[in-house]
C-alpha cells in the first residue's frame, strides 16, 4: 500500500442485509406476493438481519405506509417509484422498531440505497421523508 492510501473499505454485513431486504421487498411487490412469501421462495436461506428486516416491514406495512404517506408531501404511495417506497419502508421500520440503530445510520443507509438503485432525485427525497418521520417514529426521550 502506498503512503497516504487508505485500506479498502470492508463490506458491512448490515448494509448488505439492507440491500438484500430491498431486493426481496421489490420482488414481492412486483410479483404481488407478501414479502414473507418472497423470503420463503429463496433457494438459499437469507441471513438473520435480512429476514428480520423483511418480516418486520411485512408485519408493519400498513402502519409504515400510513406514516410515509403523512410525511411525503405531494406524493401518494401509488405515485412513488417502487424502489423509493420500499427504501422508505425499510428506513421507517428501522426508525420505529430498531432503537439500537442510530437515526443518522438509518437515514444514511436508506439514502445510499436510493441513490444507488433509484432515480437521480431519490436520495434527497428519501432523506427528506425519513428526516420528517424521525419525529413521529423515534421521538426524543
Language-model features, listed with the residues they occupy:
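N-terminal interaction/assembly modules
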Residues: 1-123, 127-141
